[in-house]
A protein has these predicted regions:
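Generic structural marker for isolated residues within well-ordered, non-membrane alpha-helices
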Residues: 25, 83, 124, 154
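A secondary-structure boundary/capping signal
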Residues: 41, 71-73, 98, 120
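Conserved AMP-binding/adenylation subdomain of ANL enzymes
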Residues: 46-67, 75-116, 126, 130
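Gly/Ser/Thr-rich phosphate-binding loop
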Residues: 89, 106, 111-119, 128-187
Length: 187
């Protein structure tokens, strides 16, 4: 017992962890109504990471070399489950910043040597509205994955910054997502 903390009055349960056991509680974004708490099992979290890691096409992950930059919060399924478990299962690295800040984006992407970046729809117009940055083309990013970018912004972003925006859509409640990762992409 650490100094200053009282000893527990009850013994911890000792048993093997099962795939069906609750691993986390995440709240939905409220897209289909009020946000709701989702009890997510270990099976769910591993399946989501495996799904993302195995998509291939425009979002093929190599083993042991990818650096996934994710500025999204860890209370969201994107950062805490999809990219985290994908990185873990493929022996890669997740670069987790404290929060998205447009003024730090290119410096963090460049300095972290990110090969994959995650975004939400609001990120793209913010980056496009910024003056040219020395690192906006001097990076190692192969693709970005996220949701909510208006179709007309894709071409401008991809031309200016040199990598594709891959749209994904999913629901925290059901561990299912769809992604436009095969050519020809329908934006």
């Amino acid at each position: 017992v650490e100094e200053g903390f009282p000893a527990s009055r009850c013994a911890a349960e000792s048993r093997a962890v099962r795939a069906s056991d609750i691993a986390s509680v995440l709240y939905t974004s409220g897209t289909t109504g009020q946000p709701k708490g989702c009890l997510l099992s270990h099976r769910y979290e591993l399946a989501a990471g495996q799904w993302y890691a195995s998509r291939g096409g425009a979002i093929a992950f190599d083993e042991g070399v990818e650096r996934i930059y994710n500025p999204l919060p860890l209370f969201h399924v994107n950062a805490s489950i999809f990219s985290f478990y994908c990185a873990m299962l493929k022996g890669n690295c997740q670069v987790q910043t404290d929060r998205f800040q447009v003024s730090r984006w290119w410096t963090e992407v460049y300095e972290s040597k990110a090969t994959v970046v995650h975004y939400l729809g609001v990120v793209v117009p913010m980056l496009l509205s910024q003056p040219a940055h020395p690192h906006e083309r001097a990076h190692t990013v192969r693709f970005a994955i996220g949701a909510g970018v208006e179709p007309q912004r894709h071409a401008a972003f991809e031309e200016r910054f040199g990598f594709p925006l891959i749209e994904i859509w999913g629901m925290t409640e059901i561990v299912r997502a769809i992604v436009d990762n095969e050519a020809p992409r329908e934006i």
